[in-house]
A protein has these predicted regions:
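Alpha-helix capping/helix-boundary segments
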Residues: 11, 46, 83, 101-102, ...
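Short active-site oxyanion
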Residues: 35-40, 73-75, 109-113
Length: 170
């Protein structure tokens, strides 16, 4: 069975902008999304953040990039009022701002792995995850994980080798 993984906005931005340090790894991640090496997920918030950030550089390219995001082989996780409420509860425990929305939609869709370069917020969430579990239980969510797995561009290749071995893709 393939891993279900949420892809954070910064992965797409680093790939699109050919970031000098993380661009190559992020481009590989985006290619692997296309190859469906894992079950990739995202949300409208990712497209909004792509549009917002890239609009500061070039509004025309920003529009194209946001539209191209929807052409990827991603399962779109829906952000609705219950996700926003849960994100607010997460922020009351560990204030990670917009990333709480990403975390809430992940948890509500039983996704416990994120590929991101935003290490600080996700490390903060991971450290306080036990404090979020009672909220998950209170909201009757069926999240099976006991933690959030954070994959970065730097450790992506090693993680990819592990999942390919465990899912017999080699």
């Amino acid at each position: 069975m393939k891993n279900k993984v949420y892809i954070d906005t910064n992965i797409f931005l680093y790939a699109m902008l050919h970031h000098p340090e993380f661009g190559n790894a992020c481009e590989e991640i985006v290619r692997d999304i296309g190859k469906m090496l894992f079950l990739s997920t995202g949300s409208n918030l990712v497209a909004m953040e792509i549009l917002g950030v890239l609009s500061k550089i070039d509004p025309n390219k920003a529009r194209k990039a946001a539209n191209d995001y929807y052409k990827l082989s991603l399962e779109e996780l829906v952000i609705d009022p219950t996700v926003i409420d849960f994100a607010g509860a997460i922020n009351e425990v560990v204030n990670i701002r917009y990333d709480a929305i990403h975390a809430a939609v992940m948890i509500m869709n039983d996704v416990n792995t994120i590929i991101t370069n935003d290490i600080d917020n996700w490390k903060k969430l991971s450290t306080h995850f036990k404090e979020i579990i009672p909220i998950i239980i209170d909201k009757s969510l069926s999240f099976v994980g006991s933690q959030m797995n954070v994959i970065t561009p730097k450790n992506y290749k090693k993680w990819k080798e592990t999942i390919m071995t465990t899912t017999n893709l080699i």
